[in-house]
From Swiss-Prot:
Residues 165-250 form the PPIase FKBP-type domain. This is Trigger factor. Gene3D superfamilies: 3.10.50.40, Trigger factor ribosome-binding domain, Trigger factor, C-terminal domain. Keywords: Cell cycle, Cell division, Chaperone, Cytoplasm, Isomerase, Rotamase. It comes from Helicobacter hepaticus (strain ATCC 51449 / 3B1).
Length: 442
């Protein structure tokens, strides 16, 4: 058994070696004993099958297992020479070249090594965050919104017409081209006028109706309406108004606060809670609209390290397969039947693959640095929640993700969000502390 090793960089190494066939044959007896322990052949007791029978029936497996053991010995010796611990390898070593000659096998093995990242100054890379002060008016507006949402609906007893901000209890049936359509009918439906719950123009057309009045209104479905067969079409609705309802707003005081946040609460503590919620909403908006993508690019620029080529190649394969799945059949066949074109198209994903692998290593290292983790239950909850929000069956969605090995990707996305939120939260707190300090000095 002979080999040479080459450390290409901190994340990649190559082993070139040869193993004599006689060395592999020395493994036969050991391999045969392993096989004998586990096989069962009619006419023989388990573990008592004659060696010659095993050699005849399992010749191919014996050759493969013995060869694998010899390669493993070569790999172990080469790792020792390279001073690489087996647990620092990432992915499986790849046999990139393999030639079987009359007296030996020659092979090349490529190794991917988990890179080491320097995260000493990572918090300095987080962009500055400027938070708007949560004003008293904003808090009061949210309080009024909460009160409005919790207010009971009471029927208007005096005779008057339907107005904006009222709630109309109606029967309705819609028609397109003179025919009723699915989902276009409702009875005793409570519709808040001004909520824009129905298609544009519908709610405004009800204003001025009286109890018991019937009215036919004409509207046009938006061009981008979710039901494609209705998009852009004119429709008429027969509407009957049964009741005019109005919300009775509660008094916003300590009792109201208790009904919202519990007996230990008062109006001031509720306002404090609302302020925290508004700050969280502001941070989330800034994170999603401005900082997430910006912070990722900053981390990619400032935390540089060698990438394991094997992992980059795997990511290129994933991106290439995803791109192929989006092609029209004729475009797919064109690439499928042209190896040169396939290689060319696959290569276009290299930069994206490198960036994806780099940010994955960065996020994993940051998660370890800050003791951030995502457990399996959180992943399941996320999958179930998103499925329900999309109107899909959660169990079927989970099975789809598991079958297509998509769960790890979801977990990685969740981890990335949590790590970035952690870094930005630290910056938010710094910004908040600086703002408070400036106020104290004024």
């Amino acid at each position: 058994m002979n080999f040479t090793t080459k450390r290409i960089n901190s994340a990649n190494a190559v082993i070139n070696g040869s193993i004599a066939l006689s060395k592999i044959e020395e493994k036969f007896e050991k391999v045969i004993k392993k096989i004998a322990k586990n096989i069962k052949i009619d006419g023989f007791r388990k573990g008592k099958v004659p060696t010659q029978v095993i050699k005849t029936r399992y010749k191919e497996q014996i050759d493969q297992d013995a060869q694998q053991e010899a390669i493993q010995e070569l790999l172990t010796a080469a790792l020792k020479e390279l001073e690489i611990q087996p647990n620092s390898l990432i992915g499986n070593p790849m046999i990139s070249q393999f030639n079987k000659l009359n007296d030996k096998i020659e092979l090349e093995i490529k190794l991917g090594i988990t890179p080491t990242l320097n995260l000493d100054n990572v918090e300095d890379y987080t962009p500055e965050v400027k938070l708007k002060t949560i004003s008293k008016n904003l808090i009061d507006e949210r309080l009024e919104e909460i009160a409005k949402n919790r207010a009971p609906l009471n029927e208007i007893t005096q005779e008057r017409t339907l107005q904006k901000d009222d709630t109309a209890q109606i029967d309705f049936e819609g028609f397109v081209d003179g025919k009723a359509f699915e989902g276009g009918k409702g009875e005793n439906f409570n519709l808040a006028i001004g909520s824009n719950q129905f298609i544009p123009g519908f709610e405004d057309a009800l204003i001025g109706m009286k109890n018991g009045e019937k009215r036919t209104i004409k509207v046009t479905f938006p061009e981008q309406y979710q039901a494609k067969h209705l998009a852009g079409k004119e429709a008429s609705f027969d509407v009957t108004l049964h009741k005019i309802l109005q919300k009775e707003l509660p008094k916003i005081d300590d009792e109201f606060a208790k009904s919202i946040a519990g007996e230990e609460s008062n109006l001031q503590s509720l306002k404090d809670m609302i302020k925290e919620q508004l700050e969280m909403e502001q941070k989330t908006e800034i994170y999603n609209k401005e900082l997430k993508e910006k912070l990722v690019e900053i981390l990619l620029k400032n935390i540089s390290f060698d990438l394991p080529d094997l992992i980059v190649e795997q990511e290129m394969d994933i991106l290439f397969r995803n791109a192929l799945s989006q092609l029209k059949p004729e475009e797919f066949d064109k690439i499928k039947n042209n190896q040169d074109e396939a290689k060319k198209q696959r290569e276009t994903h290299k930069d994206e693959a490198r960036k994806s692998v780099q940010i994955t290593f960065i996020m994993d290292a940051l998660a370890k640095k800050y003791n951030i983790a995502i457990n399996d239950n959180e992943v399941l909850q996320t999958i179930y929640y998103e499925a329900m929000m999309m109107g899909q069956d959660p169990k079927a969605t989970l099975e789809h993700y598991q079958k297509n090995n998509l769960v790890p990707a979801i977990k990685m996305t969740m981890l990335e969000d949590r790590v970035l939120h952690y870094l930005l939260d630290k910056k938010f707190e710094e910004s908040k502390a600086n703002t408070n300090a400036q106020k104290d000095n004024q």
